[in-house]
A protein has these predicted regions:
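ATP-dependent carboxylate-activation loops
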Residues: 277-298
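ATP-binding N-terminal substructure of ATP-dependent carboxylate-amine bond-forming enzymes
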Residues: 1-95, 306-309, 318, 327, ...
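A glycine-rich beta-turn/hairpin centered on an aromatic-Pro dipeptide
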Residues: 304-346
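A structural supersecondary motif
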Residues: 257, 342-358
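Phosphate-binding core of ATP-grasp and ATP-grasp-like enzymes
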Residues: 169-177, 184-228, 237-271, 275-283, ...
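Short, conserved charged micro-motifs
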Residues: 55, 129, 162-164, 330-336, ...
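Short, well-ordered beta-strand elements within core beta-sheets of diverse protein domains
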Residues: 154, 182, 227-228, 288, ...
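Active-site nucleotide/adenylate-binding loops and adjacent lid/helix of ATP-dependent enzymes
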Residues: 99-179, 199, 229-241, 245, ...
Length: 402
């Protein structure tokens, strides 16, 4: 029986555990929080911090694993590549993953290799970051180089706002490194979705529309998605070509990726992020429902050195959307009301994560979501209208904090 080590413990790991079990694989989950929900589904739990590369390597040797993954769990991606390379397991090269997972190194790589990239610079020192303020054209984005889920990210309109943003980013950074980059204003919607390569060939390239809630405490946390993308076909083709080039240059092999892209108002396509892991917010699960292609199962097969299925660029047959259920008020959860007609016509899957009486916090990050809706529509415009006006169809019942 093959043995698979999954780094992390949140609910996004559960589909991986279930898929691995379908293959007859023994699954071990690993993090330092034994009460995390994924550990209830795995065959074994290992209590180690996933950012401690040497400790995870030692455990992996003792556990005699055949594969390692860090699905939808950004802090574990570098550890996953490190352990995999040390043990000779399938996976992306550690050196390449180190570039992809550190925003300052990634921006430098893109610049050095002729990709479209915003003007950016990395810092490990508050004074130096502030001193360089005049190097940039505002607005800028200030963020940690090593965090995901919009933690520590601030859009800054002028120098006066920069001090607080720099402090905020340093506080959220594990390695105490931040990056300041010029903000790329987008034309249409940005894209945040999953892709797949086999033997350095990009075989499944998806693009979508990413939506945000301007009323949320943190307006940079994705609140919804729809497929297909509203980016022009020629921009999608150029982005696909550039993603393919990046995969080959970094020799990433066979892997699932979360990829963030956009078209700037300057008309140029930009790769904003490419991480060799699945995205959060159940993106690969939605893509399976929408396209019939199972990226999660194939990522597991790849991690274990098993042959993957034949994958092709997606055909959506209409429009699909995912809404991240969240609250902009804090309180005690009393339930969710969904418009019956809307549910009948559009809801393919609903997943509520709370019980009556549970705590609800404001939407400061992806970890404050309280469920998801997966929906089907006839057109992109219909999907976009729905996810941007979800208050018409969905009500969260709360006993609000006083």
């Amino acid at each position: 029986m093959k043995r698979l080590l999954l780094l992390g413990g949140n609910s996004y790991l559960i589909p991986y555990i279930k898929a691995a079990h379908e293959l007859g694989v023994y699954v071990i989950t690993c993090d330092y929080l034994p009460d995390n929900i994924a550990h209830k589904y795995s065959d074994e739990y290992c209590n180690i911090s996933i950012v401690d590369k040497e400790a995870v390597l030692k455990a992996a040797k003792e556990l005699k694993i055949d594969g390692i993954m860090s699905p939808a769990t950004d802090p574990g991606v570098i550890t996953c590549a490190y352990v995999g390379e040390k043990l000779g397991l399938p996976g992306c090269p550690y050196k390449s993953v180190d570039i992809l997972q550190h925003k300052d190194k990634f921006r430098k790589y893109l610049t050095d290799h002729g990709y479209n990239v915003p003007k950016a610079k990395g810092y490990n020192n508050y004074e130096k970051a502030l001193y360089d303020a005049n190097f940039f054209n505002f607005p800028v984005i200030v963020k940690p180089t090593d965090s995901a889920g919009s933690k520590g990210v601030t859009k800054v309109e002028n120098i006066e706002e920069l001090k607080q943003a720099i402090n905020h980013a340093f506080e959220a950074s594990i390695s105490k490194n931040i990056i300041i980059e010029e903000f790329i204003a987008q034309k249409g919607s940005s894209s945040d979705t999953d892709c797949f390569s086999i033997n350095n060939e990009l075989v499944f390239a998806s693009f979508n529309c990413q939506y945000f809630d301007a009323k949320a405490v943190n307006p940079y946390v994705p609140a919804a998605y729809s497929w297909p993308s509203d980016m022009p076909d020629n921009i999608q083709r150029e982005l696909r070509s550039e993603i393919q080039r990046l995969i080959k240059e970094l020799n990433l092999g066979t892997s699932l990726y979360n990829v963030e892209t956009r078209q700037g108002i300057d008309g140029k396509p930009y790769i904003m992020e490419l991480s060799p892991r699945a995205g959060g917010n159940r993106l690969s699960e939605v893509l399976k429902i929408a396209t019939g292609q199972d990226l999660i199962m194939n990522a597991i097969k790849a991690a274990l050195g098993m042959p993957t299925d034949h994958l092709t660029d997606p055909d959506y047959h209409g429009a699909w959307a995912e809404y991240i259920i969240h609250s902009n008020k804090a309180g005690t959860y009393q339930g969710i009301h969904l418009d019956p007609e809307f549910e009948k016509n559009h809801i393919v899957e609903k997943d509520y994560w709370l019980q009556v009486g549970d705590r609800v916090d404001t939407f400061t990050g992806a970890n404050r979501a309280i469920g998801t809706l997966i929906m089907k529509f006839d057109s992109h415009d219909e999907a976009a209208e729905a996810v941007q006006n979800m208050e018409r169809y969905l009500k969260i019942r709360l006993l609000e904090d006083k």
